[in-house]
Curated annotation (Swiss-Prot):
Organism: Hydrogenovibrio crunogenus (strain DSM 25203 / XCL-2) (Thiomicrospira crunogena)
GO molecular function, one term: iron ion binding
Pfam families hit by this protein: Iron_traffic
Gene3D superfamilies per the UniProt record, alphabetical: Fe(II) trafficking protein YggX
Name of the protein: Probable Fe(2+)-trafficking protein
Length: 90
């Protein structure tokens, strides 16, 4: 049976994640309030941020930056602006 959540990002009831994306309170909050679709969108946005800003997942500053951006993206009710250097491939 598919688990449904009232997704805060998409503002509708959608299929939820299968498990919290990481441990702790924030992971549980995401599990309870974010759909698979919204999480997929965040992962795409995160990839752009990592590539455009040349972030290292081992750098604590980069980890904090991504965590803040994730919270804005998922719970802030706003889409994030793309980095200035970003050029979408058509």
């Amino acid at each position: 049976m598919t688990r449904m959540v009232n997704c805060v990002k998409m503002e509708q009831e959608l299929e939820g994640l299968d498990f919290p994306p990481f441990p702790g309170d924030l992971g549980q909050k995401i599990y309870e309030n974010v759909s698979k679709e919204a999480w997929k969108q965040w992962l795409a946005q995160q990839t752009i941020l990592i590539n455009e800003y040349r972030l290292s997942s081992l750098d604590p500053k980069a980890q904090n930056f991504l965590k803040e951006e994730m919270q804005k993206f998922l719970f802030g009710g706003e889409d994030l602006e793309m980095p200035e250097e970003f050029q979408a491939i058509d």
